[in-house]
């Protein structure tokens, strides 16, 4: 039972409707859990260092903090932390990105209250409304996840920077930037240019909310 180990939930969900649904779901399962809601995300200070805390976040409503949120998710996963993330049912590209970052528990926000309650009761719960990990991303060991550099370049691309601008910003060669972009597309199975642009556009849409 998850609530026997976790004493605090760090909840990041800017949208009131989904935030209230998440809080209701958590407290219905275990009313003694402390639910902390950060006003803002600070990349330099991860949401928690305590093993008894769990980070839970809605990605689709992150707005201008989407890129900070992606970096925090990546950082926490690389630290071996378990986190819970929810996305919209049909947001296939965002689902792929979450799996590639290494998110183990991905829930469907359309059924958040139902699924989060089940996840709080069972660590092994998986959404019945989202594609499974394996058909989308194979070989999900740590070596095959997005690296820190690749995530930075993905974010730079979503912000509209050219490869030359990224090379200057990140102090690397143009060919290195190109190689990173190719690796990202391969990891996410986005061989078609249109699919790659769709992902960048989706991240920009979230940022512009």
Language-model features: locations:
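N-terminal regulatory/sensing modules of transcriptional regulators
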Residues: 1-133
């Amino acid at each position: 039972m998850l609530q026997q180990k976790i004493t605090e939930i760090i909840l990041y969900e800017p949208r009131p409707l989904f935030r209230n649904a998440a809080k209701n779901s958590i407290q219905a399962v275990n009313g003694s859990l402390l639910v902390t809601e950060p006003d803002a995300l600070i990349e330099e200070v991860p949401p928690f260092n305590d093993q008894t805390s769990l980070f839970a976040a809605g990605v689709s409503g992150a707005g201008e903090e989407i890129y900070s949120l992606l970096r925090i998710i990546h950082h926490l996963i690389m630290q071996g932390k378990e986190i819970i993330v929810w996305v919209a049912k049909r947001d296939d590209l965002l689902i792929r990105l979450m799996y590639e970052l290494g998110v183990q528990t991905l829930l469907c926000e359309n059924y958040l209250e139902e699924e989060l309650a089940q996840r709080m009761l069972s660590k092994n719960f998986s959404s019945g409304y989202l594609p499974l990990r394996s058909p989308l991303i194979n070989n999900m060991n740590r070596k095959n996840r997005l690296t820190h550099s690749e995530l930075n370049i993905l974010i730079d691309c979503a912000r509209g920077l050219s490869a030359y601008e990224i090379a200057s910003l990140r102090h690397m060669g143009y060919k290195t930037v190109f190689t990173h972009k190719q690796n990202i597309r391969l990891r996410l199975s986005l061989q078609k240019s249109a699919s790659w642009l769709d992902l960048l556009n989706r991240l920009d849409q979230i940022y512009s909310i």
